[in-house]
């Protein structure tokens, strides 16, 4: 997967930079950010080839961290815009619920567009779970006419992102066959783009069949999503 975050200078209370590029271990940064509390003032600054991070809490406690900078020899991948055959916006909390349910049955998910309907499906040794997504839970939807699309993606990478539902209320998915899932979270002065490579299925016949998603398959019951 590829994560690209663009933060404009207006997003910060104060911002001074001379165009530097720095690299550090993201795993260490995640551990530090777990110590953040609401209304804490955070400061990032360069100090003698180290990234210095300070937290000033409401009770006047102060924590200071220093991260060593590293050199990255690998080429930095640049994100590319993707125009999906289907694009929709959904509540991050709702998608988190669906992804958590899918993980009960497998570690990957099929996303299917068929006859103007959207489906999510997870399969495993203990059975299958198919969810028909009602349009009512979508804030926006753009779909090509007569689209038939089926693609598979790892659930864990989506799960990492949807756990941010307390911070980001909505996200947008742009989906096209045989290209990475493109997830976008965009707010004022802030844009996050997340690319997840599709998984290749070993069952070619299953990939080509849409019969399980015909309306007749659902005529005996209603699939309701809260």
Question: Which residues fall in each region the model found?
Answer:
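DNA polymerase sliding clamps and clamp-related checkpoint/processivity subunits
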Residues: 1-104, 110-226
